[in-house]
Regions:
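Polar/acidic, low-complexity leader/linker segments enriched in S/T/G and N/D
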Residues: 1-43
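Short beta-strand and beta-hairpin "edge-sheet" elements
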Residues: 100-144
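Intrinsically disordered, low-complexity segments enriched in serine, threonine, and glycine
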Residues: 146-272
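A short, compositionally biased
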Residues: 1-6, 94-101, 183-187
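Extracellular Ig-like/FN3 beta-sandwich strand-entry sites
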Residues: 62, 98, 245-249
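Short, acidic/charged, Gly/Pro-enriched secondary-structure junctions
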Residues: 70-118, 251
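Short amphipathic beta-strand/extended segments with alternating polar/hydrophobic composition
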Residues: 14-23, 113-120, 198-207, 232-235
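Oligomerization/assembly interface segments of phage tail-like spikes and tubes
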Residues: 44-45, 50-81, 130-144, 250
Length: 272
């Protein structure tokens, strides 16, 4: 799948700052391109059985695609190909990173979408012996792109039930970032239940000195503003899960006074 936009932003830097624009060298003939990672099927087939022994399927392969950046039209009209100093500047921008960076494509239907990726296999694009651009491989951290952060903010006096819709393409659970703030008074109990499953996330007897809580639900990391240890107040009287959302509508009940702020970067299957 190709992009029709002419500009991209990687690690906060636009390709236009490098005097480059996005190019698509494919022809105009009809074609079909994959836009979703393949399903990995785990199964065995044995003689005498027409059905497989099916163990499950998973989408694990990261999303990968190739991009091309070439000199802008103004530079081409001036007949100024890229020199070695231009190439080293581009290489320093795109490659050698030790962690995933955000990539955004500037086009109308991708304003809220971005990729978390690394760039490799950087190659010069040559025409008539001159270097006019670069091509490279984009490797994402998952099979998906991501919507920009969406914040769901709830003020709870005692208990509140609401519907939170997951926009995720992933056919499984999504784990958000969660902040619990503004609780005052004496010891506090907090409970978050998702009626999509028979489990809950519960604190019992949190001291008022604990302060605000920040919870990375995906990695199971809880930090408090006071520096006190919040893990000792977790309750396992019911099946326990860090807050998580299934695809589609989720009915969430929050019990315990305070402000609950969920931050979600929904994974979406839009290809590359």
């Amino acid at each position: 799948m190709s992009f029709y936009g002419t500009s991209m932003i990687f690690d906060g830097v636009s390709c236009e700052e490098m005097g480059l624009v996005m190019y698509d060298f494919t022809s105009n003939r009809q074609s079909a391109t994959a836009f979703a990672s393949d399903l990995e099927i785990a199964e065995d087939r044995i003689d005498g059985r027409y059905r497989s022994l099916f163990y499950g399927g998973a989408v694990n392969a990261p999303l990968t695609f190739t991009m091309v950046l070439c000199a802008s039209e103004d530079r081409a009209e001036r007949n100024e190909p890229l020199d070695r100093w231009d190439l080293q500047k581009i290489a320093a921008w795109l490659t050698g990173h030790r962690e995933y960076k955000w990539l955004s494509i500037v086009q109308e239907d991708m304003e809220e979408i971005r990729y978390r990726c690394l760039i490799s296999d950087l190659q010069a694009v040559e025409v008539a012996g001159n270097k006019w651009g670069v091509s490279f491989q984009v490797t994402c951290d998952s099979p998906y792109a991501y919507l920009r952060p969406m914040v769901y903010d709830y003020m709870v006096a005692s208990s509140l039930t609401t519907t939170l819709r997951s926009e995720s393409s992933h056919n499984g659970f999504y784990y958000p970032k969660l902040a619990i703030t503004g609780h005052t008074g004496g010891d506090l109990s907090i409970r978050i239940e998702n009626r999509m499953e028979a489990s809950s996330f519960t604190f019992q007897g949190l001291p008022s000195a604990m302060g605000d809580l920040t919870i990375d639900c995906e990695n199971g990391v809880i930090t408090s503003a006071s520096g006190l240890n919040p893990y000792q107040y977790l309750s396992y009287d019911t099946p326990f899960h860090f807050p998580r959302f299934a695809r589609g509508d989720n009915t969430i009940t929050m019990t315990g006074s305070g402000r609950y702020t969920f931050t979600c970067e929904w994974p979406v299957n839009v290809g590359g």
